[in-house]
Amino acid sequence: MSGYSNGGGYGGISSFALIVVLFILLIIVGTAFVGGF
């Protein structure tokens, strides 16, 4: 795990934060789409 975070251009925290942000945006868009109808 540590070798992967240190070897790539992305850090372990930044890649995890990016996934979390995309997941949150997906939830927001999904709730807005369902709420629209």
Curated annotation (Swiss-Prot):
| Pfam families cross-referenced by the UniProt entry | YjcZ_2
Q: Which InterPro entries match?
A: YjcZ-like (IPR010070)
Membrane topology field: Single-pass membrane protein
Sorted alphabetically, the keyword list is: Membrane, Transmembrane, Transmembrane helix
Q: Where in the cell is it found?
A: Membrane
Q: Which residues cross the membrane?
A: 16-36
**What S-S linkages are listed for this chain?**
none
Q: Which domain of life is it from?
A: Bacteria
Name the GO cellular-component terms.
membrane
Family according to the record? Belongs to the SscA family.
Protein name in UniProt = Uncharacterized membrane protein YczN
Q: Upper taxonomic classification of the species?
A: Bacteria, Bacillati, Bacillota, Bacilli, Bacillales
